[in-house]
UniProtKB/Swiss-Prot annotation:
Its EC number is 2.7.11.1. It is found in: Cytoplasm; Nucleus; Cell membrane. The keyword DNA repair does not apply. The lineage of its organism: Eukaryota, Metazoa, Chordata, Craniata, Vertebrata. Pfam families: Pkinase. This is Serine/threonine-protein kinase pim-1. It comes from the Eukaryota. The active site is at residue 167. Keywords: Apoptosis, ATP-binding, Cell cycle, Cell membrane, Cytoplasm, Kinase, Magnesium, Membrane, Metal-binding, Nucleotide-binding, Nucleus, Phosphoprotein, Proto-oncogene, Serine/threonine-protein kinase, Transferase, Ubl conjugation. Gene3D superfamilies: Phosphorylase Kinase, domain 1 (3.30.200.20), Transferase(Phosphotransferase) domain 1 (1.10.510.10). The gene is Pim1. It comes from Rattus norvegicus. Proto-oncogene with serine/threonine kinase activity involved in cell survival and cell proliferation and thus providing a selective advantage in tumorigenesis. Exerts its oncogenic activity through: the regulation of MYC transcriptional activity, the regulation of cell cycle progression and by phosphorylation and inhibition of proapoptotic proteins (BAD, MAP3K5, FOXO3). Phosphorylation of MYC leads to an increase of MYC protein stability and thereby an increase of transcriptional activity. One of its GO terms (molecular function) is ATP binding. Its cofactor is Mg(2+). Its main location: cytoplasm.
Amino acid sequence: MLLSKINSLAHLRAAPCNDLHANKLAPGKEKEPLESQYQVGPLLGSGGFGSVYSGIRVADNLPVAIKHVEKDRISDWGELPNGTRVPMEVVLLKKVSSGFSGVIRLLDWFERPDSFVLILERPEPVQDLFDFITERGALQEELARSFFWQVLEAVRHCHNCGVLHRDIKDENILIDLNRGELKLIDFGSGALLKDTVYTDFDGTRVYSPPEWIRYHRYHGRSAAVWSLGILLYDMVCGDIPFEHDEEIVKGQVYFRQRVSSECQHLIRWCLSLRPSDRPSFEEIQNHPWMQDVLLPQATAEIHLHSLSPSPSK
């Protein structure tokens, strides 16, 4: 049964990465103006990354998200093959925006005198995982397993494309409530994946690994696995396990909800204090708790379609 489901999910894993040299998006200055192509709607959110608005593509009424990033807030820059200097986020999104459905797609981008504007896909209806958990509490393990599998596949896809997200958390995961599909969003803290050590980190501290807290050094893959462990705990317990630096470096995990022993084992494995003790993506996927995963559409039918939105806490 698991094999058939894995085969059904194989299209996610086998999705190719975009070749930056086959550049499909022309530099912003060569395109029609933003205002003639997109209708800007209400503000969806804002923060250190800039502001994100809902929008509509005029040509076909496609819902989009329109992200404005001020140039003076951009700390990491990249370069396209044609020499255009752009935020690293654009480079990373172009590398991962392919046929794979588990990562948000960059549809277009524009450069303005003092900012960049990114046009991203926007599923409807949609809710981020943070709000989903806040409204409904800790997830049933069957639902958490389906969600976690999809996030793991998204992170694997990014790594296969040479991209390290560096801010895996519930707020950066969108749930398509009709299809049961998850999408990893916000690559503003990301970097090109490398085998050597990283000495910078702009992600969310409570999801960061103990080696970063203690030594300001970490390796990309093992740090990603730590963040995945935090995320899985969040799913099955309804909140993150650690709030303060001293809790992160101690790494003592206490379960506030009734969680199966297999799920507890996987979480504790991902949250091993020594990076070398953490599992690989393949070991996570082969873990006993990860077997018999629901397909996204089944997840939607069983767990999402029957639920009506409840008031936020």
